């Protein structure tokens, strides 16, 4: 299954990317209903690994994620190495839409463990949980950086995000 969320922020790509490099950012992006204990987080760098303890649908899990494809002020990705999903790949994109405007895009590709029917039945439930998680995260980003209103001029390249 795939998930994507986009938000236009009133800040430079560098500022938004740098903020994500901070260990405190991860804690701020964690919603109160999804408690997460950081076991090991060496920081964001190519091939760095982070280990967390969290709960999904009330079930406790250790989650180990590896960062890859880290491109300064452009993107970074993380993939689940150990955890509740068969596959989890999360891509964070930072696109400049002017000097002080950043389009932040989160893209997630995930597969649940078990047979295909598990994904069909539980996939929508998990998708809603992921949507709530990223709704919270993008609200945090809007509070941190402010919202850049889309231009309504149909000739503007910023009109479509």
Report each predicted region and the residues it spans:
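Hydrophobic ligand-binding cavity/cleft-lining segments
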Residues: 1-45
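Beta-strand/loop substructures that line and gate deep hydrophobic ligand-binding cavities in soluble
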Residues: 79-132
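Glycine-rich portal/gate segments that line the openings of hydrophobic small-molecule binding cavities
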Residues: 37-83, 103, 136-139, 143-149, ...
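Generic structural detector for well-ordered beta-strands
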Residues: 6-10, 37, 53, 66, ...
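Short loop segments at secondary-structure junctions
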Residues: 11-13, 71-72, 97-99
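A conserved amphipathic terminal alpha-helix motif
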Residues: 111-114, 118-161
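Short, surface-exposed coil-to-beta transition loops
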Residues: 2-4, 60-64, 87-91
């Amino acid at each position: 299954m795939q998930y994507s969320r986009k938000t236009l922020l009133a800040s430079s790509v560098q500022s938004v990317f740098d903020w994500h490099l901070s260990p405190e950012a991860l804690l701020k992006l964690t919603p109160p209903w999804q408690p997460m204990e950081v076991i090991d987080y060496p920081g964001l760098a190519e091939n760095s690994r982070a280990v967390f303890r969290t709960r999904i649908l009330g079930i406790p899990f250790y989650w180990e994620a590896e960062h890859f494809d880290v491109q300064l002020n452009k993107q970074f990705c993380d993939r689940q190495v150990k955890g509740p999903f068969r596959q989890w790949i999360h891509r964070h994109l930072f696109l400049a839409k002017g000097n002080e405007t950043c389009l932040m895009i989160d893209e997630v590709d995930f597969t649940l463990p078990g047979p295909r029917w598990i994904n069909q039945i539980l996939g929508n439930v998990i998708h809603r949980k992921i949507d709530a998680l990223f709704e919270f995260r993008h609200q945090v980003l809007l509070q941190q950086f402010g919202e850049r209103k889309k231009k309504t001029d149909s000739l503007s390249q910023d009109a479509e995000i």
